[in-house]
Amino acid sequence: MAGRPMDIRQLQYLAALAREKHFTRAAQACHVTQPTLSGRIRQLEQELGVPIVERGQRFVGFTPDGVRVLKWAHTILDNWSSLQQEIEALRNTSGSLSGHLSVGVIPSALPMAGLITKAIRDHHPAVEMTVLSQSSIDILRNLEDFAIDVGLTYLDNEPIEGMRSEAIYMERYCLLVRSDHPLARASSVTWAEAAKEPLCLLTPDMQNRRIIDRAFRSANSAPVPRLETNSVINLCANVHLMGLASVIPEYFLEVMGPISDVRAVPLSDPLVEHSVGLVAVDRDPVSPLVLAAFACAKITEPPAISRRS
């Protein structure tokens, strides 16, 4: 091996290149010139003695060795960030943390995420947060790749291995219809009855949609939605504007507030419910910000309609 020893900045440049998949954009994200970023990555390749990046006229991807180096880079950078948070916490006698927390959230849990981030903000006002709407599969992948710090997702529907978790609420479902719909005043509606309505649903890549599809199958129904979207807000808008019906979590309107001319009717036969909670990679030591997020999740009061039984 030759050249000066590897440093954190080189790993940050490498992580930025993986994220942006473009040398110039990666350099801009790191606030350096493109030649500087490219040169430091070449130095890293020389230091490790392996090619990391496949180069052509533009960024092509990572070599097999580069994929392994990138995984280690993410691990080292995450540990470096956790160390900085730990030292900051030791210096700050008030117990209030600072830093950046990235949260991945399944679309149906975005209103609940607002309650949790409010609790974090109340207890740690200097913490900056990024909240991203993601599928449950993307949340687990991004946690493993250190792209996010914590996720808010389903705990009991599809396997989550190697994760620590904290259950927050039970997701139950209702049929959302316009107030002039014949079912708007019903006390409840069966899944078989809901299947007969013109539906708008989340896209099939969303775990919420897979849950809903299974519920319909258990009621011997297989509706074909008129519209699909990856946004729960868009579902509500299409119920209000187009007169479609949709299936959403019962708690949603309780947190977001009533929507004009829209009614939520509980779904039954079968009763479907799933646990939703906070997840993070199960490792030791745990970063102070992740611990703070879990502590705030524990004290966050879910809406009465979705509290854990």
Which residues make up each language-model segment?
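Hydrophobic hinge/microswitch elements
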Residues: 109, 135-148, 154, 205-263
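C-terminal effector-binding regulatory domain of bacterial HTH transcription factors
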Residues: 1-5, 71, 89, 123-126, ...
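A short LG(V/I)-centered, amphipathic sequence patch enriched
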Residues: 45-67
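Flexible hinge/capping segments at coil-to-helix
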Residues: 162-199
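Secondary-structure junction motif
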Residues: 112, 154-155, 177, 183-184, ...
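Short beta-strand-centered segments that line the small-molecule binding cleft or hinge
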Residues: 3-5, 75, 93, 115-119, ...
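N-terminal winged-helix
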Residues: 34-35, 39, 95-124, 128-141, ...
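Short helix-boundary/capping micro-motifs
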Residues: 15-36, 59
